[in-house]
């Protein structure tokens, strides 16, 4: 069948990953819960807010990298808390310095760019995001970018050189799920770079739907960290991602208006 989908490796910045679940490291009760939930998720990429997390810049304080070692995980520094391009670029440069010299040296230019518009909605400021992306790409960063679900902005971010676009499913931390599947579908159909859902996931079914739609991967934090049992939810998310990917590859049955019997009606016993 010509429309059968074949699986392709999940590749970022020249590296191939087995897990299509990326997880954040904030909002947990303590570092031990962070470690346990991350392990249960099966994630290989963990994202870290450089401005809020000690990666070695604060000597004498607990260092997240002692709990989530770069020897085991790909550390994805992000620019959470930045509200303009200048702040975001400065934060990425700091992250590169902090991660330089670690075993994950080969992935130290991989960053997650997010430039926020305001504290209330945490919507991305797409104008400042585009400005920052242009600078970071020129400086050799591999930029994964948090953006709105506007297909035109997603296209422009890919055109300036971002290696992945990460449209929000819903507002950060809301758990509302995929609020605008139509725009997301357009982005998926048009994008020439990997598309990852970022923000808004609330439970396992949200992650599955994103993967069924054709997303390369899903990034989440609050959905796991704010669950009543974060470690158990992390494991649920691991399975949800796999199930969604398999369903996408398998291809769902067509929707029909009228019933269609599972068993043939010919030759019935009379």
UniProtKB/Swiss-Prot annotation:
rRNA-binding found in the keyword field: no
Pathway where this protein functions: Cofactor biosynthesis; thiamine diphosphate biosynthesis
Compartments where located: Cytoplasm
Pfam family, one: ThiG
Enzymatic reactions: [ThiS sulfur-carrier protein]-C-terminal-Gly-aminoethanethioate + 2-iminoacetate + 1-deoxy-D-xylulose 5-phosphate = [ThiS sulfur-carrier protein]-C-terminal Gly-Gly + 2-[(2R,5Z)-2-carboxy-4-methylthiazol-5(2H)-ylidene]ethyl phosphate + 2 H2O + H(+)
InterPro entries in the cross-refs: Aldolase_TIM, Thiazole_synthase_ThiG, ThiG
EC number annotated for this UniProt entry: 2.8.1.10
Coiled coil: none
Protein name: Thiazole synthase
Organism: Pseudomonas putida (strain ATCC 47054 / DSM 6125 / CFBP 8728 / NCIMB 11950 / KT2440)
Gene coding for it: thiG
